[in-house]
Amino acid sequence: MKENVFDVLIYLFENYLDRDTEQAPDPDEMRTELLEAGFPQREINRAFDWLETLGAQQPMRAASLPAFRIFSSEELAKLDVECRGFLMFLEQNGILTAASREVVIDRLMALNEEIISLENLKWVVLMVLFSQPSEEVAFARMENLVYESFPGYIH
């Protein structure tokens, strides 16, 4: 079984994080369940570190002026034209702000994947929006894009 950090994150999100419960899940129980499900300890630890860093980031504030994003060479190598276009689409349609886009890019780069797929990008956007207070509307809109078929978008 060749699982990576992203697979662990998706498992956690679908089974624990996206629930309407008041009580937070026990991290030790989650780790045990992940091990029993066959995920490697190293990837579990990396996923928890990824989530901890996401949770430690300050709540996002919308920029007062529109911003033009220039991607670094490392970002260009990991995020193909389709991914960059989708980020722009989300920002232009009010799902992401310039600030939330930066958090998404930071979390994508932290995955240590050679290339980020559009599917992985969508899930990371969903996780970032879920983690931020007062982003319920954007989260709901993004959730529809992840869970439902989505017609093509303009590049």
From Swiss-Prot:
Secretion signal, residue range per the UniProt entry: none
Stored InterPro entries: Smg
Database matches in PANTHER family: PROTEIN SMG
Top-level taxon of the source organism: Bacteria
Listed name of the protein: Protein Smg homolog
Similarity comment text for this entry: Belongs to the Smg family.
Pfam family, one: DUF494
